[in-house]
Amino acid sequence: MLCAVYKSRKKAETYLFIERREDFSRVPEVLMSTFGRPELVLMTKLDPAKPLGLASTERVMSALKSQGFYRLHTTWKLI
């Protein structure tokens, strides 16, 4: 499964995975307004056998199939 990954210019460390590049039709308007103008970071092929760095590949794939997008917000803590 291919997907496009965008980062938010409004919210630091916030990413949006969608099924097709530039197709935000299944992303709720309220999410798009808080996300801001998306910036393409990566096009990738999702494979359950290959882990993603910050999210469960299976969870991302499931969300893409069911709702058309997956939002990821990361927080980094220095120890």
Feature roles, as predicted:
Residues V5, L16-I18, L42-M43, L64, ...:
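Generic structural hydrophobic/aromatic packing signal, biased to beta-strands
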Residues E29-L52:
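Acidic, aromatic-enriched beta-alpha/helix-loop junctions
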Residues R21-F24, R37, L54:
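Amphipathic alpha-helical transducer elements in NTP-driven molecular machines
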Residues V5-S25, V30:
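N-terminal acidic leader/helix
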Residues A12, R37-P38, Q67:
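Structured helix-beta-strand junction loops
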Residues D23, L31, S56-V60:
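Amphipathic alpha-helical interface surfaces
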Residues L46, L52-I79:
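Helix-rich interaction surfaces within compact, conserved domain-sized segments
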Residues M1-L2:
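Extreme N-terminal starter segment of soluble prokaryotic enzymes
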